[in-house]
Amino acid sequence: MLYKRSMVENGNATQEVLNSIPHRFPFLFVDRVVSLTEGRIVAERILRKEEFFFQGHYPQMPLMPGVLICEAIFQTAGILMSKKLINQASVEGKVPVLTRINSAKFKRMAFPGDTLNLEASFEQKVKDFYFFKGTAKKQDQILVSIEFVLGMVDAKGL
């Protein structure tokens, strides 16, 4: 999928990321793809102190909300779908959306200045639904591990 949308600002996101998923600033949480194979992707996000969520979560001890770490993993899986898993012609006019979370474990926190290593592994496909396992790490320590499903839905209905 090649997403062409006007961009006010997209942080440090590479063109590869911007072309692969529809997310844009301020809700784009992947900076770059580190590695990509047929069924696995590793991406990266550097957490800048200016991030909008650090302003109120929490002012005395800014940390990235766990749900946004999960979103970064979901976006990483969306890039994998776009680059390796889907037939572009069959999904014209569709976008990947989260349809299920099977499990999520939150083990550590992410702070300004941290670099998140985001991993997503493709498990199986059932119709238009793609099953994944994902993790977010910093310095090889797992912050979040999650199992989830992304589905391709008609963008006109959004």
Short names for language-model regions:
Residues 2-5, 9-11, 78-117, 143, ...:
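Hydrophobic beta-strand-centered segment that forms part of the acyl-chain substrate-binding groove
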Residues 14-24, 91:
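Short aromatic-glycine motifs in intrinsically disordered, low-complexity regions
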Residues 18, 60-61, 106-108:
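Beta-strand-rich interaction surfaces with strong enrichment in secreted/lumenal proteins
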Residues 24, 34, 40, 46-47, ...:
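Terminal leader/tail segments of proteins
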Residues 25-64, 69:
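Catalytic strand-loop segment that frames the active site of acyl-thioester-processing enzymes
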Residues 33, 64-90:
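Active-site helix/loop of acyl-thioester processing domains in fatty-acid/polyketide metabolism
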Residues 33, 100-139:
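Hydrophobic beta-sheet segments that form the core/acyl-binding groove
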Residues 129-156:
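Mixed-charge, glycine-accented linear interaction segment located at domain edges/termini
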